[in-house]
């Protein structure tokens, strides 16, 4: 069995594939990895090792991550999200590995225009929401309106449940996790919507709730334990779990290590988790 050092020094995608098919990494074509949960720029409350885009790209390449869906950390506190999204697109245009995911704050004027620009001007595949930071809940009319307009525009919607652990949050800005309880009702009213929940630390009751909702997907960034990812795959509908790291707020190696050290996923499972499910989500 390969160890962590081999995994992280040898190119994660190639090493992971070789380990499950039982051949040497030299004989194995590199497995694609799509990271559905990246962010660019600086976190407002502290510097992070990978908050420089060049360093983040270098780390992605070292780990074999071939594509990253990137939101903007500027969206947390900035009010001019049109400019935030424009800067994101400009930076991503210089890095073919990055796919920009626009940010929408429905409590601000002209959020409908921001959503339209994400779709029509910037040709983004999806948008990202931060309800707790922007002051609304999933039961507010804003969320239903976003789902309706995003679905009409062919955009998926990512909902960041949290951005950092409560224990590390600034003492003057404690931000609770998003409450998922209203989600089943809202999704029933928007059957064509595609919603990916980001940064969820799955609990049994939450997974039981989410597994029953058509159109809901999860990422792996905060799944804990060496058996956490296989357990999540076993409880959620097929194709509904996508690989994500939550870099730069979390180190991307962590998500890869947890996936590898489960020693349960076979080649088919890995391919689906790393790339197939994300591709299907894009085309759904």
Label each residue range with its predicted role.
Residues 37-41, 160:
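Histidine-centered divalent metal-coordination motifs
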Residues 122-126, 139-242:
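Catalytic pocket-lining loop regions of alpha/beta-barrel enzymes
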